[in-house]
Amino acid sequence: MMIEALGVTEAATRSALENHVRKLGLEKGVMIAKKDFKKTEKVSKPFENIKTAYSGVVELEVLTKDYDRLVFLVLNYAPSAIEVLEPKKISIDAGEAQGILNSLAELMHRFVGLTRGGIMVDTK
């Protein structure tokens, strides 16, 4: 799993990635087996109104208790890329499929809330 961040300073970028990875590792049914923070790079004009920023990447090897947990991580931690190494074949029962679909439905509802001028915030 690769996660990227863009920040206004090198320290802010690194800190944001470290906090994001820390929170991911605290999720139930998730274990981070390996983490590799890549060198933060200076980026010129990443956006029209920003002169410079810093791009950071962390590569993670993550173990999850089931596929539903992996989908949860993708939806809530927004990795740039995912590679499933094992198992070679995945089968899920109806209950797990339903959980995954409900997670997707919840995400869609959050997007709808954003497009109507509101934002749904997790206060935890």
Language model region names:
Residues 1-124:
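Long, contiguous binding/interaction regions
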